[in-house]
C-alpha cells in the first residue's frame, strides 16, 4: 500500500495538502497518533491502495528513536513517502493572525513566536526522514495543490524533477533548497549604472557576466558537480532536486547563472523548472504598489470632484 505522510509546521498548509490528496483519490486520515499508524495501516491495507495521513506536533513522539522505529516498521510492508511543509516565521505569524486560531503549543502558555520556534525543534527528527520538503511561503492554495500533484506524478513516473531557482540572500535562503550556491563573490553588474535597472535575463547583463572568465568557470564547475552526482540522486527514489543560486539581491548574477544551469539540463532532456524568486517577489511588490497608487489617485479624484461640486453649489 502507498502511504503519504503529510506533516510540517502548523500553519504551513497541511489541511490544504490533505484536501488536495483526497481530490486525487487518496483515502485521507487527519491527525492520528504516530504510534497507532501500524495498526491503522494493517486495517486500511485490506481495502485501500493509496492512503494519505496528516500528522501534527501533537501526534509525533518526543523520542527520535521511537519515530525512526515506527517508520522502519511501516517501510517493511508499505511504500512510505513523507512530505514536510515549511514556511518562514513571518508568514506563519501572519497566517495565524489572519485565521485567529491558536497554535497547538500556545496551550503551554507560550507566545505565538515562541510556539513556532519550539515546534520546529520538536519536528527536526521528522525533517530528516522527509522525501519532499515544500516551502509554502509564497505558494497559493492552488499552487500548493499543483506541486503535490507534480510530486505524485513524479512518484508514478519515477522521474526526477529539477528545480533551478535564483534568490537574493537579503530575503533569506529558500527553505526547500537541496543545494545552495553562493555567487556573491562574482563581478556585480549592480555597480554599472547602465546595468543596475536590468536583470540577469536581459542581454546587456548576460554579455557583461559572460565576459568574465570566473563566471564561466563557476558555471562549468557547478554543471560538472551536478552532472557527476545526478545519476545517484535519480536512483535514490527522489522526486525533486532543488538547486538554489544566490546573490545579494537576486536580480543579476544569480538570475543569469540559474538560467544558464536550467537551460543546460533542459537541453540534456531533463525535466527542469527555472524560477527566479526575488524577481517574482519584486513584481508582486511593484504590482501591489501600483494598485495602491491607483486606489489613492481614484480616492483623491473622487474627493476633489465632490469638493468641486460642493463649492459650485454653495457659490
Swiss-Prot record:
Function of the protein: Displays ATPase and GTPase activities.
Signal peptide start-end: none
Keywords in alphabetical order: ATP-binding, GTP-binding, Nucleotide-binding
Gene3D superfamilies per UniProt: P-loop containing nucleotide triphosphate hydrolases
Binding of ATP, residues: 8-15
Xref: HAMAP family: RapZ_like (MF_00636)
Protein name as it appears in the record: Nucleotide-binding protein CGSHiEE_06315
Domain of life according to the entry: Bacteria
Organism: Haemophilus influenzae (strain PittEE)
Cross-referenced SUPFAM superfamilies: P-loop containing nucleoside triphosphate hydrolases
Stated family: Belongs to the RapZ-like family.
Amino acid at each position: 500500500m502507498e502511504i503519504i505522510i503529510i506533516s510540517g509546521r502548523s500553519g504551513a498548509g497541511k489541511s490544504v495538502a490533505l484536501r488536495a490528496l483526497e481530490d486525487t483519490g487518496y483515502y485521507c486520515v487527519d491527525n492520528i497518533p504516530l504510534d497507532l499508524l501500524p495498526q491503522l495501516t494493517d486495517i486500511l491495507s485490506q481495502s485501500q491502495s493509496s492512503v494519505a495521513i496528516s500528522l501534527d506536533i501533537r501526534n509525533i513522539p518526543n523520542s527520535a528513536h521511537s519515530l525512526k522505529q515506527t517508520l522502519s516498521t511501516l517501510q517493511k510492508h508499505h511504500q512510505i513517502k513523507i512530505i514536510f511543509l515549511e514556511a518562514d516565521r513571518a508568514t506563519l505569524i501572519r497566517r495565524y493572525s489572519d485565521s485567529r486560531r491558536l497554535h497547538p503549543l500556545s496551550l503551554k502558555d507560550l507566545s505565538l513566536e515562541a510556539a513556532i520556534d519550539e515546534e520546529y525543534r520538536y519536528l527536526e527528527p521528522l525533517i530528516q526522514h522527509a522525501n519532499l520538503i515544500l516551502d509554502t511561503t509564497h505558494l497559493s492554495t492552488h499552487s500548493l495543490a499543483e506541486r503535490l500533484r507534480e510530486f505524485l506524478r513524479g512518484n508514478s513516473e519515477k522521474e526526477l524533477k529539477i528545480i533551478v531557482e535564483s534568490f537574493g540572500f537579503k530575503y533569506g535562503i529558500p527553505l526547500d533548497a537541496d543545494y545552495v550556491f553562493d555567487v556573491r563573490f562574482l563581478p556585480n553588474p549592480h555597480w554599472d549604472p547602465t546595468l543596475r535597472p536590468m536583470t540577469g535575463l536581459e542581454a546587456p547583463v548576460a554579455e557583461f557576466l559572460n565576459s568574465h572568465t570566473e563566471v564561466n568557470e563557476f558555471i562549468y564547475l557547478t554543471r560538472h558537480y551536478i552532472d557527476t552526482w545526478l545519476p545517484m540522486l535519480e536512483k535514490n527514489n527522489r522526486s525533486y532536486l532543488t538547486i538554489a543560486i544566490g546573490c545579494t539581491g537576486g536580480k543579476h548574477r544569480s538570475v543569469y547563472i540559474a538560467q544558464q544551469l536550467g537551460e543546460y539540463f533542459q537541453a540534456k532532456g531533463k525535466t527542469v523548472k527555472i524560477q527566479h524568486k526575488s524577481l517574482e517577489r519584486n513584481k508582486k511588490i511593484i504590482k501591489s504598489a501600483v494598485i495602491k497608487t491607483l486606489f489613492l489617485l481614484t480616492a483623491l479624484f473622487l474627493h476633489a470632484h465632490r469638493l468641486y461640486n460642493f463649492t459650485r453649489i454653495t457659490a
